Amino acid sequence: MKDKIIVKGAKVHNLKNVSLEIPRDKLIVFTGLSGSGKSSLAFDTIYAEGQRRYVESLSSYARQFLGQMDKPDVESIEGLSPAISIDQKTTSRNPRSTVGTVTEIYDYLRLLYARVGVPHCPKCGKEITQQSVDQIVDQIMELPERSKIMILAPIIRGRKGTHEKVLENIKKQGFVRARIDGEIYDLTEDEIKLEKNIKHNIEAVVDRIIVKDGIEGRLTDSIETSLKMAEGLVLVNIIGEEDRLYSEHFACADCGISIDELAPRMFSFNSPFGKCERCDGLGTLMEIDEDLVVPNKDLSIRGGAISTWGDSRMKEESWTYCVLKALMEKYNFDLDTPYKDLPKKVQEVLMYGEPEKLKVTYTKENVTAVYNHSFEGEINNLRRRYMETNSDTMKAEIEKYMSDNPCPKCKGARLKPEALAVTVGGKNIFEFTSMAIREELDFINSINFSEKDKIISSQIIKEIQSRLSFLINVGLDYLDLARKAGTLSGGEAQRIRLATQIGSQLMGVLYILDEPSIGLHQRDNDRLISTLKQLRDVGNTLIVVEHDEDTMREADYIVDIGPGAGEHGGKIVASGTLDEIMSNENSLTGKYLTGAKKVELPEERRKGNGNFITVKGAKENNLKNVTAKFPLGTLTMVTGVSGSGKSTLVNEILYKGLNKIVNKAKDLPGKFKEITGYENIDKIIDIDQSPIGRTPRSNSATYTGTFDIIRELFSQTQEAKMRGYKPGRFSFNVKGGRCEACSGDGIIKIEMQFLSDVYVPCEVCKGKNIADVLNMTVEEALEFFENIPRIKNKLQTLMDVGLGYIRLGQPSTQLSGGEAQRIKLAYELSKRSTGKTLYILDEPTTGLHIHDVNRLVKILQRLVDGGNTVIVIEHNLDMIKCADYIVDLGPEGGDKGGTIIATGTPEKIAETKESYTGKYLKKYL
């Protein structure tokens, strides 16, 4: 077997005929500037070919159902294994996906609860047991000898009526006695008259026995008779003791509620046998939200407090106004009082209606009449219209005033009451999955099973323990299994898939990972690296596209790709061990690793402009009533270990809260008391890593508005004027402008069924969407348009953020998250600054080489120099050391986090003993 992977002549994207040898069964890091060609070599060449060869070994029938990779543009690759890629793009956004389902731990939990779970009555909470006749007989025979017992068949349990037919029926079956409401009656002699409106209990006396050896046969017959008469129930009355009730079904003898036999599907929120019927297993329901109906409670009703009422409904001749007039007379309020100052009762009536009919005086066409009208309230009105309408437009309009709320029936647990009434170790499956992963492992280890249950559950428990341990090892101990997969960051989702792969214990596989350290604090890096080594030691080859210094120092082999980005990259600058990279003169990475180059500390830390934005009483997720101050006019970093509450504080509370206050957005922020100081800013901009567009038609030129100016420019040319072309003629989205043969895509897709689809340039337009301009890189276009200031300024900002290598027409679907974020940053930089803007960024260093981080720091400093405020969630210490102010959260992740450990300059944080960030930051200052 070859001990090397040999790549010859790779020309994918910007790779310049790259040939490379890398050792097998080692941990290999691919590094280099953003856009240098790392992903093109790792994912689009090596992974694509490994995956393609594996899929080609399957039958043509099977290949139709599998995603077929394109054959990469490479002469040959030798020594390949089947390849598995773990990137950040494939996080499931399905609201039904949770951490538990993605890792498959939930499947094992369903099996555990179905096999050793203890069912309880969903109504009264009593334990429900299912027993055979033999088990019931054995329990009775354990009573002290000579015990006097009565076998009763409980036919009526707590039901009103005279029950004459029931008593007649007992008599017909040959039974002489019955116990009615605790009293024994002789059915042949006593005249029994029961009161109709009182609940009664009626039990037929099947047998009276003294417990002794040799009565088993008689006892079995009596119990079987009782079970038949009472539909699976038997009551044993022991003289001098409480009655014992036995059931041969899973049914509560007291409430009469029966549950199905326990099966794994009963615990699945995706199965009709397990999911809550009210919310369909989602755990949340879309409900009309009062905060969206009345977004600004400082306004009066006349001033537009109720956003669903337009101006026309406030005119005095309108029906709504006449109804309000009747309400004003009844409750004594006026339409000019701010909504928040109206009495609670009035607010309630306006939203949920008036139970009593109102006398409404209404004039139309000079005819005045008095109507008896019941006012249903705005929320009830919207809810009714939403339920009744068949119009998608109307539904979409009303949905603007709806938000996701926990389902009132299952309280967010997603399952039926019967499934939630089953416990293992005293916890139901939802309570178990809601704990942090580290607590789940402790809980599983602490359960005391009976000998029988121990044998049944041992294999299942082993699988659950190993999978939970892997998640803890990749630094995800703070997550819970009930967490929705769509709410995970790219790094978290990737590490979850990494843990799943370790759990599979495969060997001889080629794993290709894309920056697994994203979102991970330095403290947890060691655990991630040891996990990667564990995967290598089993006998796998790992290629990791990574910029993290610790990972590079621990790697067996490093490949540095460059020297620049885009057209200036695509070559192997250096490859070898850490020492070989550090001693290579051409390697930019080597210079940063030796310290010859570094991100410089700022000359001084800004104090800010004296104003602050303060979040008070933040309590969302794991935040423990936090009050955080953010100085305006500074570069502020929010730091802390993974899961400490950074994203919750900044994205869920600060951004959404300010967005609602300043921009009147409909975002629903997390729980907090108040935000102060917002009057000092006029814009809030969140620059995240979501795609700038989801179709090949969107690109950096359309997003930044450069394309509009270019089209305008084309329409000003002499030839265009002669032909009467307007800017729209140069759009690839508009008929008349676009090529109709390919609908403006520039390429035509030919489906090949079990082979991968082929894309060919359109023969009519030769793939030129608008001349050759869109095919230029930003760098080339900047030179081409240098005399046109409006275009030049926009392109210059793209250059400044390090995106000179991307083509203007490069589809947004081909851009990485980091590139999309920097295009947004460039777009913001190209706007005229007001000096009062708040920018929020979540890990902007994702996908960035240390050299790119250096460039990014300068751009952010430029924004702050213009008087703006930048708040960044960050783990990268080269970035953190350049901050003016730091808010450090912790001390741990999950329940053990959610408090502010320290605030102040990087130097102050480094001196704080409790701060993990400070501990690692020290050596960077």
Spell out what each predicted region is.
Residues 1-925:
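Conserved phosphate-binding elements of NTP-dependent enzyme cores
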